[in-house]
């Protein structure tokens, strides 16, 4: 899929990929070999036939394993290659991926599709609005300094330039974490929002009289993710890569080279809630029930660490108490409750653990804001304890308590909650 896109935006020369898959003289084995050769060159850069292929890197082609292709699969490849993939809506990747999963595991894997409008209700108050407020406060400062400047390079111009570079440094170092990223819908919109804000500031700074910077400082490095399913995590990386390339194409920026793709190791494939330290320890000391198949030398469950981020956004998986045991197992469920004892009450929905972890990071000063989607059951019962803890240590400043939404083909009611360090007036419907 990435190669379809890369070819249609000019990163691969001369309809090379389409020509390869459309060569009807190739047997399945020869086509597989041709794809393997192309992917190897894309990984390292260099000649493929007479064409010079850019160094793509990024990790997408790190492990090259091409499955055998049936006649029907080769036909489907040819049909797909005939389409124009340059304007593919990367937000549909989640839906495509979800349909390939066992429906009973969709909630557990967290790979359900969230429409852009819903994501926007989280991204706007948590990411976009606070950054735009910082920029809007900086603009009159730049205006005042440049009004005193008589020529480029004088002390007032340099002072304005330093202020603007400070703003760009803030954007460059900004980190957006989705700790249940699925196939990357929230990360894609977060990246687009950051780049839109930076682009706007470059245009306005140039209008004020500052020299235009050559390139942007925001990019895939700003996006952090955690996802349990390996395939979903890889799709999230592809979503971010294509989102970056599409944005640059749309706004007239050249593609980066050497490499074309930034490594996205910071979109991690692992559990966002629990980590397991190696044993050995006596089975009697394990924070798991006896008889769960974990004896001498079993790993010790501890709270999983999240990478340092500026904000957290996301749509954690929806699992109630009984479904947690059915889908995650008794041992995992008991371990989770013991590790978070005193913070998340037993019997609370799975999604509340993400809320509590975000709250704790805000309280410890490592995180500014968070915006998460939950089922509307978070408003009451044992789930409510987590919201009360958020209100005590920080504040909920924007929320939608009962919104319609579709998950795994079923209509559900959700709550969207933005909380953290914000001075904005509360918007609570």
Spell out what each predicted region is.
Residues 136-167, 198-216, 245-263:
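Short mixed-charge
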Residues 10-18, 25-32, 37-40, 117, ...:
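Signature of N6-adenine DNA methyltransferases within the class I
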Residues 2-195, 222-232, 239, 270-284, ...:
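Preference for the N-terminal adenyl/adenosyl cofactor-binding alpha/beta module
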Residues 286-289:
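Positively charged N-terminal leader segments that act as targeting/secretion signals
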Residues 291-293:
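Glycine-biased, low-complexity coil/linker segments
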Residues 72-77, 99-103, 217-218, 266, ...:
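Short acidic (Asp/Glu) and glycine-rich catalytic loops that position anionic groups and cofactors
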């Amino acid at each position: 899929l990435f190669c379809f896109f890369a070819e249609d935006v000019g990163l691969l020369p001369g309809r090379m990929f389409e020509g390869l898959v459309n060569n009807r003289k190739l047997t399945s084995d020869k086509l597989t070999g041709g794809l393997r050769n192309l992917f190897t060159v894309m990984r390292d850069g260099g000649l493929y036939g007479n064409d010079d292929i850019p160094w793509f890197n990024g990790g997408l082609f790190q492990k090259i394993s091409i499955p055998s292709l049936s006649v029907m699969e080769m036909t489907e490849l040819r049909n797909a290659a005939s389409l124009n993939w340059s304007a593919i809506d990367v937000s549909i990747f989640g839906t495509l991926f979800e349909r390939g999963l066992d429906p009973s595991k969709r909630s557990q894997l967290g790979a359900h599709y969230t429409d852009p409008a819903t994501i926007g209700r989280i991204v706007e108050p948590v990411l976009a609005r606070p950054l735009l407020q910082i920029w809007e406060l900086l603009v009159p400062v730049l205006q005042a300094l440049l009004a005193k400047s008589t020529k480029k390079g004088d002390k007032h111009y340099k002072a304005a330039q330093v202020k603007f570079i400070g703003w760009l440094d803030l954007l460059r170092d900004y980190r957006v974490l989705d700790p249940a990223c699925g196939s990357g819908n929230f990360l894609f919109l977060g990246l687009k929002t950051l780049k839109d804000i930076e682009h706007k500031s470059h245009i306005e700074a140039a209008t004020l009289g500052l020299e235009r910077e050559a390139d942007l400082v925001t990019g895939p490095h700003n996006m952090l993710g955690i996802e349990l399913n390996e395939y979903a995590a890889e799709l999230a990386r592809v979503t971010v890569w294509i989102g970056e390339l599409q944005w640059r194409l749309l706004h007239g920026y050249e593609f980066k080279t050497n490499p074309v793709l930034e490594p996205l190791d910071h979109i991690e494939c692992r559990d966002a809630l629990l980590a397991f330290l190696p044993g050995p320890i006596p089975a009697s000391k394990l924070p798991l029930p006896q008889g769960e198949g974990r004896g001498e030398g079993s790993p010790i469950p501890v709270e999983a660490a999240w990478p340092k981020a500026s904000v957290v956004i996301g749509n954690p998986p929806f699992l109630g108490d009984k479904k947690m045991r059915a889908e995650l197992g008794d041992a995992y469920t008991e371990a989770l409750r013991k590790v978070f004892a005193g913070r998340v009450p037993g019997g609370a929905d799975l999604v509340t653990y993400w809320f509590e972890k975000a709250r704790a990071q805000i309280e410890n000063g490592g995180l500014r804001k968070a915006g998460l989607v939950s089922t509307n059951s978070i408003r009451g019962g044992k789930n409510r304890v987590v919201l009360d803890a958020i209100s005590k240590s920080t504040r909920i400043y924007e929320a939608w308590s009962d919104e319609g939404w579709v998950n795994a083909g079923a209509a559900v009611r959700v709550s969207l909650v933005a909380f953290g360090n914000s001075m904005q007036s509360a918007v609570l419907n």
